[in-house]
Amino acid sequence: MAKIISGLEKPNKGQVLVDAINTSNKKSFLDLRKKVGIVFQNPENQIIFNNIEDELSFALKNLKLNDTDLRIEEALKKVKIDKNKIGELDELSLGQKQKITIAGVLAVNPDYIVFDEPTTMIDSEGKEAVYKIIKNLKENGYTIIYITNNTEEIMLADKIMILDDGKIVEQIKKEDLLNKVDILKKYNLKIPTVITILEKLKKNNIDINTENLSIEGITDRIIEVMNNEKRN
């Protein structure tokens, strides 16, 4: 799906349009690359150069975008990387490399960013760094398509789509997911930990009001309630 949306592969049939751009049209490929950025699972398959300046400026030059230095500076700020502290890229951890690939996408400043299982290859510290970047991007108005098999990560989303055999079979708003856990069970998907904890607390007559709370807010509320229970 990620490769089709970004124009790297053609659909088996029909067509995919991104803001009226046909993703299969080779003549529109550069326009599509400016509009849709993509971050893959393995950053080592996405990084071409061993120098951070060369890596981040490569796509900008190919797409004939101006203000290269400013774009790179702003992109690195968003992923919290100081380029002066970065040596050769092949010496970085996978988590750091993934932050570099995200910066490369952000430098182009696309309308949409596709994250295709971006935390699969990285450790827990790297995962948390990527999650924070995504949350900040959402807060700053970026439109993100996040593809994952890890149901813990669906809590990052505002709207959740479940695909089965390449077809969209369910669409759920995140705030509705708490009351629609059976949908996940129907497709043999793991229940996110935060929802499992809420269900266990409810069985112990501890009911947490989750109305108007984000998932992060619910997590904080669970911690608060559990701390209060310990004190009592």
Q: Predicted segment positions?
A:
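Helix-to-loop junction immediately C-terminal to a conserved catalytic motif
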Residues: 6
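Conserved ABC transporter NBD signature motif
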Residues: 14-24, 32
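Conserved ABC ATPase "signature" region
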Residues: 66-84
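Conserved ABC ATPase signature
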Residues: 88-92, 96
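Catalytic Walker B motif of ABC-type/P-loop ATPase nucleotide-binding domains
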Residues: 113-117
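ABC ATPase nucleotide-binding domains
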Residues: 183-232
